[in-house]
C-alpha cells in the first residue's frame, strides 16, 4: 500500500491510520483536513526543538536560542524535510491546488509536516513525537551553532566554500510555473565538491536558491 512507503520514510507506523490520512489532507480537498493538526504540530515542534537547543547550548542566551529555533522550524526547513519524505506524492489536494502545483508549494508542504507531527502525538504521545522530530532534525541539530542561525543558507554555503578556497556555487533557473502572482521557481545549484546537481524549489528565485543551498549544506553536514 502506498501509505506504507510513507510510514517507512518518516520512521513511524501508525496504530490509527486515520490520523495520518487527515494530516495529508489539505483544506482544499475536504472539510476534515489538516489545519487543526498543523496548529497543534506547530506547538509540539517549537517545544521539542526549544528543549533540544536548551539542553545542547547551556551557554547560549535567550536571543540566540530563539534565533536558532526560528531557523530550524521555519517554512523553508520544514519544506526540505517534506521533500525528503516525498510528501507531495501522498498529499490529498483539491483540483485547483493540484492544477497550480500546490504539492510543490513550501507553505503547503511545511504545514503538512507539522500536521504529521501532531498526528504522531495523537497516535502515540509526546515522547514518540519528540523522538521522530529529533531523528528528522539530527543533522541540523548537530551542526547548529549560536550565531549561524542569523545567516541564510546561501551565505553559509558561500562562506564554507570560500574557507576552503573552492569555487562559488553556480545557480541556474530551470523552470518557472504559474501566474505572475503565484509562481513556482525551480533552480539548480552545483558545486565542485559534488557531481550531483541539487534542485531547489520556491515561490521566488531567491527562495529556490536558498532551498538548493540548504540541501547542499545538509549533504555536507554543515
Swiss-Prot record:
SMART domains: DSRM, RIBOc. GO terms for biological process: mRNA processing; regulation of gene expression; rRNA processing; tRNA processing. Residues 152-222 form the DRBM domain. It catalyses: Endonucleolytic cleavage to 5'-phosphomonoester. It is an enzyme of class 3 (hydrolase). Its EC number is 3.1.26.3. The keyword RNA-binding applies. GO terms for molecular function: double-stranded RNA binding; metal ion binding; ribonuclease III activity; rRNA binding. Mg(2+) binds at residues 38, 111, 114. Its cofactor is Mg(2+). InterPro entries: dsRBD_dom, RNase_III, RNase_III_dom, RNase_III_sf. The active site is at residues 42, 114. Residues 3-125 form the RNase III domain. GO terms for cellular component: cytoplasm. Homodimer. This is Ribonuclease 3. It comes from Haemophilus ducreyi (strain 35000HP / ATCC 700724). The gene is rnc.
Amino acid at each position: 500500500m502506498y501509505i506504507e512507503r510513507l510510514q517507512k520514510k518518516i520512521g513511524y507506523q501508525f496504530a490509527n491510520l486515520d490520523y495520518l490520512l487527515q494530516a495529508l489532507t489539505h483544506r482544499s480537498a475536504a472539510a476534515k483536513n489538516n489545519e487543526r493538526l498543523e496548529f497543534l504540530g506547530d506547538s509540539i515542534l517549537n517545544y521539542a526543538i526549544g528543549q533540544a537547543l536548551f539542553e545542547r547550548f547551556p551557554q547560549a542566551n535567550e536571543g540566540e536560542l530563539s534565533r536558532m529555533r526560528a531557523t530550524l522550524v521555519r517554512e523553508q526547513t520544514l519544506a526540505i524535510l517534506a521533500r525528503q519524505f516525498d510528501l507531495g506524492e501522498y498529499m490529498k489536494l483539491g483540483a485547483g491546488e493540484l492544477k497550480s502545483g500546490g504539492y510543490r508549494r513550501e507553505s503547503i508542504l511545511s504545514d503538512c509536516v507539522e500536521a504529521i507531527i501532531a498526528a504522531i502525538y495523537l497516535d502515540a504521545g509526546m515522547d514518540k513525537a519528540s523522538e521522530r522530530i529529533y531523528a528528522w532534525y539530527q543533522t541540523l541539530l548537530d551542526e547548529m551553532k549560536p550565531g549561524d542561525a542569523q545567516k541564510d543558507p546561501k551565505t553559509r554555503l558561500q562562506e564554507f566554500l570560500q574557507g576552503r578556497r573552492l569555487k562559488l556555487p553556480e545557480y541556474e533557473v530551470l523552470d518557472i510555473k504559474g501566474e505572475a502572482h503565484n509562481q513556482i521557481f525551480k533552480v539548480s545549484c552545483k558545486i565542485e565538491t559534488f557531481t550531483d546537481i541539487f534542485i531547489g524549489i520556491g515561490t521566488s528565485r531567491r527562495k529556490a536558491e536558498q532551498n538548493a543551498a540548504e540541501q547542499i549544506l545538509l549533504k555536507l553536514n554543515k
